[in-house]
From Swiss-Prot:
Organism placement in taxonomy: Bacteria, Bacillati, Cyanobacteriota, Cyanophyceae, Synechococcales
InterPro entries listed in its UniProt record: PSII_PsbT, PSII_PsbT_sf
Record carries keyword Transmembrane helix: yes
Keyword annotations of the record: Membrane, Photosynthesis, Photosystem II, Thylakoid, Transmembrane, Transmembrane helix
One GO term (biological process): photosynthesis
Membrane topology, from the record: Single-pass membrane protein
Coiled-coil parts of chain: none
Role description: Found at the monomer-monomer interface of the photosystem II (PS II) dimer, plays a role in assembly and dimerization of PSII. PSII is a light-driven water plastoquinone oxidoreductase, using light energy to abstract electrons from H(2)O, generating a proton gradient subsequently used for ATP formation.
Gene name in the database record: psbT
Gene Ontology CC: one annotated term: photosystem II reaction center
Transmembrane regions listed in the UniProt entry: 3-23
Location in or out of the cell: Cellular thylakoid membrane
SUPFAM superfamilies: Photosystem II reaction center protein T, PsbT
Name under which the protein is recorded: Photosystem II reaction center protein T
Similarity section: Belongs to the PsbT family.
Length: 31
């Protein structure tokens, strides 16, 4: 159960980083 919580927090952190970069710059990753 602890590993599941760790993966969930890690996913949230990566998603936050991705959205921060995506909204800071014009989306260049899709192309």
């Amino acid at each position: 159960m602890e590993s599941f919580a760790y993966i969930l927090i890690l996913t949230l952190a990566i998603a936050t980083l991705f959205f921060a970069i995506a909204f800071r710059d014009p989306p260049k990753i899709g192309k």
